[in-house]
């Protein structure tokens, strides 16, 4: 963690000291963030002993502090909102427990490039050319949203929050095959909801976002995303009309369609298997399963 000044460090320490009280009083004791335990003062001491990692907990809280420029009031509000949302939405279930429509597997993919530049090693791909072919999937927006959040959570599992070279994700939005279509209102509504969720509940996790094969007809999409985000995030956006130029930015991406160095595998073959949840995430999922049985 790198603080710009003593004031930032003071705010961080105050927030971290308040964390157990916030979790107890404002979050119904729910303390899981991206699969990691936050409450170092849990009354269930065995849980702290088994699952608490102070370095990771501090790294995650630091990210939220950084996202809100060390504004204490905003940080507290964000922590409470995030934990309460996670308790109600249950993104761990979306990532590891639920069975999603098989067709969605062609819409969103996850790749891992351990030898690439810092923070370009975990990449989520959104293939809008596939989306327009499967508009029926968006009749029930909640199903797509749960799938997309699940994909995000699985990507987070591949990050190392103690490693500055791999504690952010990169995203690719590919619009190949969309030039002759306009995304209909249901797809737009889903997109808008997902953007809002990422902005509010996943702060300071995006390193870069590449928009590739973007036809002028879809300029609304880029404008929509810009309207939801702050200036710092907008600086992370790169628009490429030619998808084959992506290899200049993500060297390990497939040579096919994207101009990367991997000539053996296309994007579908690069798609990684579902990673194993963190030990604490497994504990929570097992506890939920036992409650369901009861």
From Swiss-Prot:
GO terms for molecular function: heme binding; metal ion binding; phosphatidylinositol transfer activity. GO terms for cellular component: cortical endoplasmic reticulum; cytosol; endoplasmic reticulum membrane; plasma membrane. Heme binds at residues 128, 148, 173, 175, 209. It comes from the Eukaryota. GO terms for biological process: Golgi to plasma membrane protein transport; phosphatidylinositol metabolic process; regulation of establishment of cell polarity; regulation of exocytosis. Keywords: Cytoplasm, Endoplasmic reticulum, Heme, Iron, Lipid transport, Membrane, Metal-binding, Microsome, Transport. InterPro entries: CRAL-TRIO_dom, CRAL-TRIO_dom_sf, Sfh5. The keyword Secreted does not apply. CDD domains: SEC14 (cd00170). Pfam families: CRAL_TRIO. The keyword Nucleotide-binding does not apply. Residues 97-266 form the CRAL-TRIO domain. This is Phosphatidylinositol transfer protein SFH5.
């Amino acid at each position: 963690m790198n603080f710009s000044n003593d004031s930032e460090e003071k705010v961080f320490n105050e927030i971290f000291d308040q964390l157990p009280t916030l979790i107890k009083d404002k979050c119904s004791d729910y303390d899981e963030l991206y699969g990691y335990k936050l409450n170092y003062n849990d009354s269930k001491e065995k849980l702290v002993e088994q699952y608490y990692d102070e370095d990771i907990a501090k790294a995650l809280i630091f990210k939220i502090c950084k996202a809100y420029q060390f504004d204490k009031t905003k940080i507290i509000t964000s922590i409470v909102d995030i934990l309460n949302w996670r308790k109600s939405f249950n993104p761990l279930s979306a990532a590891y427990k639920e069975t999603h429509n098989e067709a969605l597997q062609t819409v969103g993919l996850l790749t891992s490039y351990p030898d690439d530049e810092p923070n370009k090693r975990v990449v989520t791909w959104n293939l809008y050319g596939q989306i327009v072919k499967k508009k029926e999937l968006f009749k029930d927006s909640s199903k797509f949203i749960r799938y997309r959040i699940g994909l995000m959570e699985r990507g987070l599992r591949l990050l190392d929050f103690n490693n500055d070279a791999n504690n952010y994700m990169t995203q690719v939005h590919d619009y190949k095959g969309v030039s002759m279509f306009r995304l209909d209102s249901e797809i737009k509504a889903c997109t808008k909801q997902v953007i809002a969720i990422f902005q509010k509940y996943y702060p300071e996790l995006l390193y870069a976002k590449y928009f590739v094969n973007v036809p002028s007809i879809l300029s609304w999409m880029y404008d929509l995303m810009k309207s939801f985000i702050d200036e710092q995030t907008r600086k992370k956006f790169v628009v490429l009309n030619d998808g084959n130029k992506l290899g200049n930015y993500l060297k390990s991406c497939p040579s096919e369609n994207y101009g990367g160095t991997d000539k053996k595998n296309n994007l579908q073959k690069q798609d990684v298997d579902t990673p194993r949840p963190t030990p604490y995430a497994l504990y929570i999922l097992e506890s939920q399963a036992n409650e369901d049985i009861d």
